[in-house]
């Protein structure tokens, strides 16, 4: 869903695709890691939520370890945020000069378009429209 949302963020607000993905990735990782998602992904290999476990495995490969998978994920996200800062990625969509009024005017259509994007169906957790909207708002304003 990160890629789907980044497609629309770039299309509506002219942000480079890599920047759009970077602005969204940590919000999407937290969303995907929910142990009790509202709706699972559509592919059969996702019989139960295991995204948190997979993120923790990725973190371990990068030398990041916490006392459990949830702490490991948060430490991993901190490392990703540090990397983003080191390469000059700003903290929020707003920091890139995206006008707040225009962002809010386009938000509902971006949400719908991201939901319908071909990449969304591959996400391990299938998002509700309200959940996509919440992630966009977090990425715009910061948490």
Task: Please give the residue ranges for each predicted region.
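Short, amphipathic C-terminal "tail helix"
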Residues: 102-143
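Short alpha-helical scaffolding segments that buttress acidic/His motifs in well-ordered protein cores
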Residues: 5, 25-29, 80, 84, ...
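Residue-level detector of well-ordered alpha-helical segments, enriched
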Residues: 1, 5, 20-24, 54, ...
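Glycine-rich phosphate/pyrophosphate-binding beta-alpha loops
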Residues: 1-21, 116-122
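Gly/Pro-rich interdomain helix-loop hinge
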Residues: 15, 19-102
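Short coil/turn segments at secondary-structure boundaries
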Residues: 4-5, 71, 94-97, 124-130
């Amino acid at each position: 869903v990160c890629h789907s949302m980044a497609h629309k963020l770039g299309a509506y607000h002219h942000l480079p695709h890599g920047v759009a993905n970077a602005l969204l990735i940590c919000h999407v990782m937290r969303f995907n890691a929910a142990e009790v998602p509202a709706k699972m992904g559509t592919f059969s290999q996702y019989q139960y939520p295991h995204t948190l476990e997979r993120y923790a495995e990725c973190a371990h490969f990068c030398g990041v370890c916490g006392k459990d998978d949830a702490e490991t994920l948060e430490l991993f996200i901190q490392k990703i945020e540090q990397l983003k800062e080191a390469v000059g990625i700003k903290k929020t969509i707003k920091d890139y000069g995206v006008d707040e009024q225009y962002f809010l005017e386009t938000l509902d259509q971006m949400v719908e378009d991201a939901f319908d994007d071909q990449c969304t169906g591959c996400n391990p957790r299938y998002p509700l429209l309200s959940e996509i909207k919440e992630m966009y708002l977090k990425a715009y304003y910061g948490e």
